[in-house]
Amino acid sequence: MRVVLDTNALIRAHGRTSTQARILLEELLRADHELITSNELLAEVTKVLRYPRFQALYGLSEADLLDYTQLLQSVSQVVILDSSYRAPLRDPNDLIVLQTAERGEADILCTNDGNFYDPTILSYCTARGIEVCDESTLLERLMQGG
């Protein structure tokens, strides 16, 4: 199964946590599924983890951030995005996530972001063979051997 975890999931999945997102990432990799990322997605994750509130919460050093980014790059298929990409999303920041899924021919785009559950976006994704599901649903599926 080819999976894109959205920015928020990847932020919560770094090595200093035991969150559902971290368990999901570990299970994806353990079960030999393919994680799909893009340089833009990884840059956004790194940028957000540098925000003061996340630094206060997680206390990640620059070395920790570099290690995490390198880990994600090494275990994922990194796809190249097109800056002219357009899709019917309300939040332009979500374009990176959606384009990563589309370019990477993902089977699943895993997100808890309500914008992706808009009927227009669900139809857009379905037409491209991409299922949108939340972290809990995907983790449950993986735990059942899916």
Features from the language model and the residues they span:
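Hydrophobic/aromatic ligand-binding patch that stacks against planar heteroaromatic rings
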Residues: 27, 100, 124
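Short, well-structured N-terminal submotif of metal-dependent ribonuclease cores
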Residues: 1-37
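Acidic, PIN/NYN-like endoribonuclease modules and their adjacent C-terminal/linker elements
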Residues: 104-108, 114-146
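PIN-domain endoribonuclease scaffold, especially VapC-family toxins
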Residues: 27-84
